[in-house]
C-alpha cells in the first residue's frame, strides 16, 4: 500500500500520500463489478479465514486440547467471558455471544490486514464497511429493546429516570440526538477514523523515508534513519490499536445490548 504513494515528482518536491490512496480502483477487468475493489476482496477473504480457523479448531475436540483447539477455545472464551458475560451478564448473555464473537474477529482480521506486508490495507480504512457494521449493531440494539420492553422502549431510551420534570424539555432532545442519531455515527467513525489515521501516518512515514534516502544531502539521508525508527514504532503501535479497536467496537455493542435489556432500571 505504501508503494502506491510516490513521494517525489520530477520537481524533487515531497508529495505525501492522501486519503484518496485508500480509494482503490476495481480489481476486475469488466465494468459490471466496478465496486469490487481490494477492500471487498479482503473482506470476503477474512470470512474464509475466520471460518476455516474455527472449523479446524473444533473439528476434533479432545479432553486435552491440542494447540489449535486450545487457541480456538481461548479466543471464544475471551469474547464469551470478558465481553458478553462481564457486560451483559445474567442468563441472557449467551444469546448474544455469536453476534459479539463474529463482530470481534471480523473486525480484528480486517484491521490486522494493515500490518501484513504486501497487503497493508485495513479494510475499515474505508468508511463504508464501518457504516454497515454500525447499522447492524444499531438495528439489533433497537430490536432487542423493543422485544424486551415493547414500544415503550423508546420512552425508556429518551426519558431518564429520576430527572426533575422541569428539566425534561432540555434532556429529552439531548437523549434523542445522542441515542438515535449520534450513537451509530460515532460507533462507525471511531473505527474508521482510527484505522484511516494510523495507516495514513505509516504511509507518510514510508514515503518520507524513500524521499530522504533519494536526496543528495548527507544530513537528509541520515535523517531517514530517525524517520525509519519512528515508522517502526508507529507500525507496532498501529498493530496494537488494530486489536484494541476490535475490542472497543465489540465492547460498546455489548454495552448497548445490556442497556436495551435493562432499560427500565437505568
Swiss-Prot record:
Membrane topology qualifier: Multi-pass membrane protein
GO molecular function: proton-transporting ATP synthase activity, rotational mechanism
Keyword Flavoprotein: no
Record keywords: ATP synthesis, Cell membrane, CF(0), Hydrogen ion transport, Ion transport, Membrane, Transmembrane, Transmembrane helix, Transport
Keyword Membrane appears in the UniProt entry: yes
TM helices/strands, residue ranges: 38-58, 99-119, 126-146, 162-182, 191-211, 224-244
Pfam families named in the record: ATP-synt_A
GO cellular component: plasma membrane; proton-transporting ATP synthase complex
CDD domains noted in UniProt: ATP-synt_Fo_a_6 (cd00310)
Chief localization: membrane
Protein location: Cell membrane
Cross-referenced InterPro entries: ATP_synth_F0_asu, ATP_synth_F0_asu_bact/mt, F0_ATP_A_sf
Subunit structure: F-type ATPases have 2 components, CF(1) - the catalytic core - and CF(0) - the membrane proton channel. CF(1) has five subunits: alpha(3), beta(3), gamma(1), delta(1), epsilon(1). CF(0) has three main subunits: a(1), b(2) and c(9-12). The alpha and beta chains form an alternating ring which encloses part of the gamma chain. CF(1) is attached to CF(0) by a central stalk formed by the gamma and epsilon chains, while a peripheral stalk is formed by the delta and b chains.
The protein's role, per its UniProt record: Key component of the proton channel; it plays a direct role in the translocation of protons across the membrane.
Family: Belongs to the ATPase A chain family.
Protein's name according to its UniProt entry: ATP synthase subunit a
